[in-house]
Every structure is written in structure tokens, then in C-alpha cells.
């Protein structure tokens, strides 16, 4: 049970963390473009 729960949590968190990293990188890229202009 514990292993299944942990695997479920990991499978749920991994896509969220990857999406968060992409969003933060995209926002920083947008800010950099605005600052350069």
C-alpha cells in the first residue's frame, strides 16, 4: 500500500514540477525580451 501511494504521489508530482519549470522559464524569457526592448 505504501509503495503504491508513494509511486502515485511521484507520478502526480513529476509532471507538475516539469510544467512549473517550463512556465517559470517561459516567464523569465518573456521578461528578458521586454527588458531588452
Swiss-Prot record:
The protein's role, per its UniProt record: Component of the cytochrome b6-f complex, which mediates electron transfer between photosystem II (PSII) and photosystem I (PSI), cyclic electron flow around PSI, and state transitions. PetG is required for either the stability or assembly of the cytochrome b6-f complex.
Assembly and binders: The 4 large subunits of the cytochrome b6-f complex are cytochrome b6, subunit IV (17 kDa polypeptide, PetD), cytochrome f and the Rieske protein, while the 4 small subunits are PetG, PetL, PetM and PetN. The complex functions as a dimer.
Which HAMAP family does UniProt cross-reference here? Cytb6_f_PetG
Locations listed in the record: Plastid, Chloroplast thylakoid membrane
Gene Ontology MF, one: electron transporter, transferring electrons within cytochrome b6/f complex of photosystem II activity
Choose one Gene Ontology CC annotation of this protein and give it: chloroplast thylakoid membrane
One Pfam family linked to the record: PetG
NCBIfam families from the xrefs? PRK00665.1
What is the native source organism of this protein?
Chlorella vulgaris (Green alga)
How is this protein positioned relative to the membrane?
Single-pass membrane protein
**Protein name per Swiss-Prot or TrEMBL:** Cytochrome b6-f complex subunit 5
Gene name, per UniProt, is petG
The UniProt similarity line reads: Belongs to the PetG family.
Amino acid at each position: 500500500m505504501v509503495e503504491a501511494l508513494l509511486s502515485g504521489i511521484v507520478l502526480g508530482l513529476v509532471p507538475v514540477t516539469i510544467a512549473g519549470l517550463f512556465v517559470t522559464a517561459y516567464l523569465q524569457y518573456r521578461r528578458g525580451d521586454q527588458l531588452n526592448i
